[in-house]
């Protein structure tokens, strides 16, 4: 008598063998998020409840992309993506790591630039290896497009942060205290000549009802410009680093072991590589 469920069992065993590290990390992070979710429900902090639910949804994205695009994500890349989501949403927002650790946001944006360049690079590399696609990009163009893809994602994210700040006052674009500013709005002639104010030590806010409040911050409050520029710059660094690494990876015909940990491949390519290695072993 045949057992129709046997192939499924075998496939689960294979999946566990190949994705053991990813599965363990996923279970640990998901359990942690669920515990945080219960705590936030108990505290009636529904904004954080939403962040927890969003995190759980984002955790499913890597496996969803693998199924929909018929690709295989390297374990290292998948684990980093999961840790990145957890670090940004749970630790950063709910755990207030953005405030506790001043460079937390900078590190995440650098990782974002690196990861997005890897994803953009891999998508083009998959198309390059597909015989049904009628164009073929050189290694240099692959690197340039991957870099541009990563920077575009970074810019779109800054648009999102700005929208959240404007409409919901989330303060996602973190503030910076500056001591010198230059602005044409203070030009007494109404011209285009910037007036420079130096050594600012405090700012007094006057509200519509006449209430005056000295902020006592020790300088002028910049409400996001410096943070946005820093985020885009470190995104640029991350994207540039991976684009250079990816360029040499393609030149060497995919022999770099380090880069392979970050570049998804089409499943038919994986099958071909496994078949080839099997033939070499038998010989």
Predicted regions and their residues:
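Membrane-interface helix caps and helix-loop-helix hairpins in membrane proteins
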Residues: 41-46, 68-71, 94-104
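Alpha-helical transmembrane segments of multi-pass membrane proteins
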Residues: 59-63, 84-89, 146, 150-157, ...
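Structural signature of hydrophobic alpha-helical transmembrane segments
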Residues: 42-56
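Interfacial helix-loop-helix junctions of multi-pass membrane proteins
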Residues: 94-105, 154-155, 159-242, 247
């Amino acid at each position: 008598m045949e057992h129709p469920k046997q192939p499924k069992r075998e496939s689960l065993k294979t999946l566990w063998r190949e994705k053991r590290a990813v599965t363990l990390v996923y279970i640990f992070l998901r359990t942690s998020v669920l515990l945080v979710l219960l705590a936030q429900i108990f505290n009636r902090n529904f904004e954080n409840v939403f962040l927890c639910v969003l995190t759980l949804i984002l955790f499913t994205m890597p496996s969803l992309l693998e199924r929909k695009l018929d690709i295989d994500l390297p374990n290292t890349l998948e684990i980093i993506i999961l840790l990145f989501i957890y670090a940004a949403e749970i630790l950063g927002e709910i755990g207030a790591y953005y405030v506790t650790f001043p460079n937390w946001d900078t590190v995440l944006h650098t990782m974002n630039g690196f990861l997005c360049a890897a994803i953009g690079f891999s998508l083009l590399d998959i198309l390059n290896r597909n015989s049904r696609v009628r164009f073929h990009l050189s290694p240099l163009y692959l690197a340039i497009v991957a870099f541009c893809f990563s920077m575009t994602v970074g810019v779109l994210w800054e648009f999102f942060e700005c929208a959240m700040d404007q409409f919901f006052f989330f303060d996602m674009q973190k503030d910076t205290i500056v001591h010198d500013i230059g602005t044409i709005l203070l030009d007494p002639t109404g011209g285009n000549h910037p007036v420079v104010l130096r050594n600012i030590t405090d700012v007094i806010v006057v509200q519509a009802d006449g209430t005056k409040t000295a902020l006592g911050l020790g300088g002028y409050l910049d409400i996001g410009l410096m943070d946005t520029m820093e985020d885009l710059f470190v995104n640029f660094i991350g994207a540039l680093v991976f684009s250079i690494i990816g360029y040499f990876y393609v030149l060497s015909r995919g022999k770099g072991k380090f880069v392979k940990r970050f570049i998804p491949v089409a499943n038919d390519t994986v099958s071909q590589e496994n078949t080839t290695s099997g033939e070499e072993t038998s010989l």
